C-alpha cells in the first residue's frame, strides 16, 4: 500500500517534505462511500489516494517535474532541510561530514571508471534512491543507504594507485 505516501509526494499541497494532514479528509470521504463495498476499507483508502496522486501528476506534469527536482535537492542538500535542525553548528557538522565524502566519491568514480561494472554499481543505490524519492517525499535521511556504496568510491579516491589488474608482490 503506497497510496498515502504517493499522495504525500504528488498532490496540490506537496512540498517535498512529509505532511500527512490530508489523511483524515481521505478517511472521511472513503467512509461516506463505505456502504456495500466488497474490498477492505484500507485497500479502498489506498486506491483512492493513489488514484488522486496519479491524476494530479497527470494533470500537472510541469508541477510534478518541478516537485521531483525539489525532492532531489532535499535529498542531496548539504545541510538539513528541517528548520529545527538548521542552526549553524548543526549545518557545519552535517556539511563537514557529507561534502568531503561526496567530493571523494566523485574523485573515486573518476579513478575507477575504467575498471568497469563493479565500481559503476556503487552509484546504483544513489540513482535508485534519488529516483524513488523524486516520486515520494524526500529528506537527507534517505541518502544514508546510498552513502554506504559511495563511501567505497571515496576510499578509492584516497587509496593507492588503481589499475585494471591486481597488484603482485615480489618475493624476497
Regions found by a protein language model. Give the residues of each.
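Central hydrophobic cores of alpha-helical transmembrane segments
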Residues: 1, 121-128
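Membrane-proximal stem/loop segments at transmembrane-domain junctions that anchor or position
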Residues: 1-70
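Membrane-interface anchor segments at the N-terminal boundary of transmembrane helices
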Residues: 55-122
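Alpha-helical transmembrane segments of multipass membrane proteins
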Residues: 106-109, 130-134
Amino acid at each position: 500500500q503506497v497510496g498515502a505516501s504517493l499522495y504525500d509526494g504528488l498532490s496540490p499541497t506537496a512540498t517535498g517534505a512529509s505532511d500527512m494532514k490530508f489523511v483524515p479528509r481521505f478517511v472521511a470521504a472513503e467512509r461516506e462511500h463505505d456502504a456495500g463495498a466488497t474490498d477492505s476499507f484500507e485497500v479502498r483508502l489506498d486506491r483512492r489516494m493513489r488514484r488522486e496522486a496519479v491524476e494530479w501528476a497527470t494533470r500537472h506534469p510541469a508541477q510534478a517535474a518541478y516537485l521531483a527536482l525539489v525532492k532531489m535537492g532535499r535529498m542531496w542538500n548539504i545541510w538539513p532541510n528541517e528548520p529545527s535542525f538548521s542552526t549553524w553548528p548543526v549545518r557545519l557538522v552535517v556539511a563537514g561530514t557529507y561534502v568531503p565524502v561526496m567530493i571523494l566519491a566523485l574523485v573515486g568514480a573518476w579513478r575507477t571508471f575504467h575498471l568497469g561494472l563493479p565500481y559503476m554499481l556503487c552509484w546504483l543505490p544513489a540513482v535508485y534512491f534519488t529516483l524513488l524519492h523524486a516520486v515520494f517525499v524526500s529528506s537527507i535521511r534517505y541518502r544514508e543507504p546510498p552513502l554506504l556504496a559511495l563511501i567505497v568510491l571515496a576510499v578509492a579516491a584516497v587509496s593507492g594507485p588503481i589499475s585494471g589488474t591486481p597488484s603482485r608482490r615480489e618475493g624476497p
